[in-house]
Amino acid sequence: MKAPSSNGVSPNPVEGERRNINSELWHACAGPLISLPPAGSLVVYFPQGHSEQVAASMQKQTDFIPSYPNLPSKLICMLHNVTLNADPETDEVYAQMTLQPVNKYDRDALLASDMGLKLNRQPNEFFCKTLTASDTSTHGGFSVPRRAAEKIFPALDFSMQPPCQELVAKDIHDNTWTFRHIYRGQPKRHLLTTGWSVFVSTKRLFAGDSVLFIRDGKAQLLLGIRRANRQQPALSSSVISSDSMHIGVLAAAAHANANNSPFTIFYNPRAAPAEFVVPLAKYTKAMYAQVSLGMRFRMIFETEECGVRRYMGTVTGISDLDPVRWKNSQWRNLQIGWDESAAGDRPSRVSVWDIEPVLTPFYICPPPFFRPRFSGQPGMPDDETDMESALKRAMPWLDNSLEMKDPSSTIFPGLSLVQWMNMQQQNGQLPSAAAQPGFFPSMLSPTAALHNNLGGTDDPSKLLSFQTPHGGISSSNLQFNKQNQQAPMSQLPQPPTTLSQQQQLQQLLHSSLNHQQQQSQSQQQQQQQQLLQQQQQLQSQQHSNNNQSQSQQQQQLLQQQQQQQLQQQHQQPLQQQTQQQQLRTQPLQSHSHPQPQQLQQHKLQQLQVPQNQLYNGQQAAQQHQSQQASTHHLQPQLVSGSMASSVITPPSSSLNQSFQQQQQQSKQLQQAHHHLGASTSQSSVIETSKSSSNLMSAPPQETQFSRQVEQQQPPGLNGQNQQTLLQQKAHQAQAQQIFQQSLLEQPHIQFQLLQRLQQQQQQQFLSPQSQLPHHQLQSQQLQQLPTLSQGHQFPSSCTNNGLSTLQPPQMLVSRPQEKQNPPVGGGVKAYSGITDGGDAPSSSTSPSTNNCQISSSGFLNRSQSGPAILIPDAAIDMSGNLVQDLYSKSDMRLKQELVGQQKSKASLTDHQLEASASGTSYGLDGGENNRQQNFLAPTFGLDGDSRNSLLGGANVDNGFVPDTLLSRGYDSQKDLQNMLSNYGGVTNDIGTEMSTSAVRTQSFGVPNVPAISNDLAVNDAGVLGGGLWPAQTQRMRTYTKVQKRGSVGRSIDVNRYRGYDELRHDLARMFGIEGQLEDPQTSDWKLVYVDHENDILLVGDDPWEEFVNCVQSIKILSSAEVQQMSLDGNFAGVPVTNQACSGGDSGNAWRGHYDDNSATSFNR
């Protein structure tokens, strides 16, 4: 051993630290989880944690530590200086820090604290090995793993026999040590012989201690020691020498806090149970994720040989660790429970900045993606899977409303922020819902949040919390629920809005409702006065026209009404074309941004008008007078005005109250007509009821109303009354247009309207002249929706394709006359109503920008479905070409029919591209040659659910498909997926499947293919299974891949094994290493697997059931491969494809990273 060199002190110009030892070696000896904050940054000092370090070092219980009432539980300090030291006797590392409490801090200090978190102080190239008994013996040497020697040590000259060299390394005190490095033995291995025994005896190393070799930035070989955690009598005198220092640390902190003076502390990372000097940025980040009972989290622990591992746990309590001396302290205020039974020496209480919150409450294998759930019929058992039932039993606070994920959310992959917050407040099972207001704060200013958080309060429940909007789940929460067979319409998802917009809108709604009730009383009085004035005018008109007989007026009125019926029947197709032309000119309402007050006023009008206008046709039919034909048009408007003053009722009671209001108002109007001396004729009532039903079935136009008024005018009515009636009819036309447009946003109004339409339909079938069938009414309601933009024009009519108004509607997909390039987000989504039971998904999203006209609500001919609704692309958060994941339950009966139809269907043509049978299909954009080409999708005759009522597709480019897809044989799901995922060098996760649980998911990543436009249509296989696209049975992987270097990979079914012993025995037999895998302690082979968190774990640590559920792939590693993983220091450094549980369609989890021919295995 050579004499130690002099230790110089050199300041660090970047961090302001004064170092006398190598920083990389210090951090390597301190541990992989230690990273000291830089000098000049802000830190949070916890005296309670400092007391724990003193108690652990002096082996003195915390009960004997005195209390300091003037010392708060935390101090915001400026870190002036950091000095890295090591004990000269034991080589234990520690740091000396100079802190000064501060009350105010500037932005530069905050930035310095934030930048300190991003600095990686651990060495890049190092090797750590735990010493064995042979390594510490006096007659032996130190065995170095092959990959560690090749990576850290200089290269050997293998031309020598035996190959050997001399190594020179420096320890943490800058002492130089010389060793002989030789490559010998059988089998041959790297050994350190000469000089090693001297090093072991001088440093007093024992079995269990660790030795580190690192190569710093100057290519110098450094040597460090990390001793095992043993009970030591006391620390060295350089850290703490007496009990007075034990008590003095708190007194020094209290004095510094009172005078804002600097004080010095010593931090021993190997002895301290947890770091008590926390960077301010780390502390603030932890405060943003406020915890609640039942929250899942991960925590990183150090393992052997400088490795780390994440353990999962659950927060079981929030309370003070020491409520007497440290009240409202955030130090170890979380009581936790670990998932694994063998917790070992893991603590039972942690601090919030020590954990990583799992941002989904169900972070359990499989990954947190639930497919849409549908509540079953009353009294019928739900066919939920075992995995989902187990999740509900384990976490009862989950309900069926937590379903679809937000694909664009990066901080909350399972749920959106508002969904999770509403779940916490709505469900009473969460005990901390009232105490903990939220899981994440609102978008607050960082500086203001820090000042409010750290300046005055110590209550963790008041730190950076935010309030969620009142009510239930927000409009951004897409809920897909089964509906009973009595309810023909499903609740449509509302367009997503931001949190601030929801709060503003709800506040305006509450204030406007009170104002609306006050105005309704005054409006009702004015309407009654207008009614009396109109009755007086009618009486005067009756006296002036007494020269005409009553019988002649009745005959003339009947003739006019019959002529009106014939004209309306002939003009019905022309009205449809007129409506479609008007639909083209309507601007896109969703692209406009009205003020919040205008929004809420428009909402109130849409809420009131539909309820007030539902039964105008029936009331008008009961209250017509034969003498004055003008009252036929006047009374519905009066009824509408009187009903407008009613208060909005909930959906459950609005129907009954509407009937009661109808009966009361009809009695009042009948009494008013008795004063006029009018008599009602039964024949006129029948005819007028027909005309009123026409008003409900077809949207009226102003010309239509003017024609009716002219035909039904009494001979003696003057011009002023005619103008008044025309104005009334115009207002009524506008009210009905608003009424039909509001159907999209008021699902309970849709329910009432459909019941009313069914009643009218029955009455029309009894009469000799029935007007329109139900499906045509729905198509007319669909035509009232606003278009996307003025450039997106729908075809004006479907009559050119042979569609009659009374034939079953077909699905027409056409291209516009001119190619439009709408902005991003200008696509069309189509949602279909739920009409029948089953387990098919209730929606079909399509990010296609093809302009398609949906002429009916559905094309499955099992039953009539609700109207298909087109909503703008802004209603659902989609980005670029990313196809939203669809998760659907598989119907075995439908699957058998799909298989049977697949055998009988013909092969693909040039215009037909089959992509998937049960997942997602892609329609490629049409080219210039077929923009004006229309094709008609046939009606499917599947005995399945009729919810998937949209065929989302477009014409296929005649030039692109045969050359690059069909001619090359891309006619299977796997080939198409590989083509899409590998095109342009973009790698995506495709086709995730699993066999060990009943949940089956699929994820398709679609890159930005230049030859394909953004017109990608996503359809459910329930629609595409029996038409132009032949069905194909989906491959499902039920085996787990096992690999071993030098051998051909095998596949096994882990479900058929009963435990680890059978698994090890069978794997050893498969790969010809019988007897070498059964005992993991003495075996040279290590059996590892990749779990659902993409971590490489040792087989046998977890319970067998958890292993079966979470294994993705298995690897048999040799001892040299395990040492290389330890050398890299990152057990989770091998990227793994996105798979769920046991294997997947997308290939081997080790492919491209660790295979027999890969030169970069484990970052080698």
Swiss-Prot record:
The keyword Heme does not apply. GO terms for molecular function: DNA binding; DNA-binding transcription factor activity. Keywords: Activator, Auxin signaling pathway, Developmental protein, DNA-binding, Nucleus, Transcription, Transcription regulation. The keyword DNA-binding applies. Residues 464-489, 637-651, 678-710, 791-808, 903-921 have a biased composition (Polar residues). Disruption phenotype: The arf7-1 arf19-2 double mutant is defective in callus formation. GO terms for biological process: auxin-activated signaling pathway; blue light signaling pathway; callus formation; gravitropism; lateral root development; lateral root formation; leaf development; phototropism. Signal peptide: none annotated. Pfam families: ARF_AD (PF06507), AUX_IAA (PF02309), B3 (PF02362). Its main location: nucleus. Homodimers and heterodimers. Interacts with the auxin-responsive proteins IAA1 and IAA12 (BODENLOS). Interacts (via PB1 domain) with IAA17 (via PB1 domain). Interacts with IAA19. Interacts with ARF5. Binds to JMJ30. Binds to ATXR2 in the nucleus. Auxin response factors (ARFs) are transcriptional factors that bind specifically to the DNA sequence 5'-TGTCTC-3' found in the auxin-responsive promoter elements (AuxREs). Acts as a transcriptional activator of several tropic stimulus-induced (TSI) genes, including SAUR50. Formation of heterodimers with Aux/IAA proteins may alter their ability to modulate early auxin response genes expression. Required for differential growth responses of aerial tissues. Involved in ethylene responses. Regulates lateral root formation through direct regulation of LBD16 and/or LBD29. The PB1 domain provides both positive and negative electrostatic interfaces for directional protein interaction. This is Auxin response factor 7. The gene is ARF7.
